[in-house]
Amino acid sequence: MRLNSLRPAAGSRPDANRVGRGAGTGNGKTAGRGHKGQHSRSGGFTKVGFEGGQMPLQRRVPKVGFRSRKALTRAEVRLSELNKVEGDTVDLLTLKQAGIINRGVRTAKVIASGKVERAVTVQGLAVTKGAREAIEAAGGKVEA
């Protein structure tokens, strides 16, 4: 066996469909393009989304909302999620290590949702008034 004698397995590569080569082939004369019209011509195509001059769907439907790029760098943390953090101090780094917030987050805010079950020290995070009261009631403290 040599490289120049390698052949694909029989039947694994079907022959290309040769159009316009006689009526007996089933693709002769019009070559599968039908009669007349834009699509029968060479270069005959329409842009994606083109609806023949009618106002296309993409332009008929109103624009709605947007995705804030600030949301990618900010996060909200529930009080109940503070229990998942190991250790007594909670800051941006420990929240990331616990898998509570994403890597790209730069600022986080603790909101009053759920309960804190142990005393924790919150450092460098924004805290709502209700969350601050709950943390202090559990014996913890909030540091700027």
From Swiss-Prot:
List, in alphabetical order, the Gene Ontology terms for molecular function in this entry.
rRNA binding; structural constituent of ribosome
Could you list this entry's UniProt keywords, alphabetically sorted: Ribonucleoprotein, Ribosomal protein, RNA-binding, rRNA-binding
Q: Please name the InterPro entries in this protein's record.
A: Ribosomal_uL15 (IPR030878), Ribosomal_uL15/eL18 (IPR021131), Ribosomal_uL15/eL18_sf (IPR036227), Ribosomal_uL15_bac-type (IPR005749), Ribosomal_uL15_CS (IPR001196)
> One cellular component GO annotation, for this chain's record?
cytosolic large ribosomal subunit
Would you kindly state one Gene Ontology biological process term found in this protein's UniProt entry? translation
Q: Where is this region: Disordered?
A: 1-60
Give the matching PROSITE patterns: RIBOSOMAL_L15 (PS00475)
Which stretches does UniProt call biased (Gly residues)? 21-31
Q: How is this protein organized at the quaternary level?
A: Part of the 50S ribosomal subunit.
Its function? Binds to the 23S rRNA.
Q: Which family does it belong to?
A: Belongs to the universal ribosomal protein uL15 family.
Protein name per its UniProtKB record: Large ribosomal subunit protein uL15
What would be the name of the gene that encodes this protein? Answer: rplO
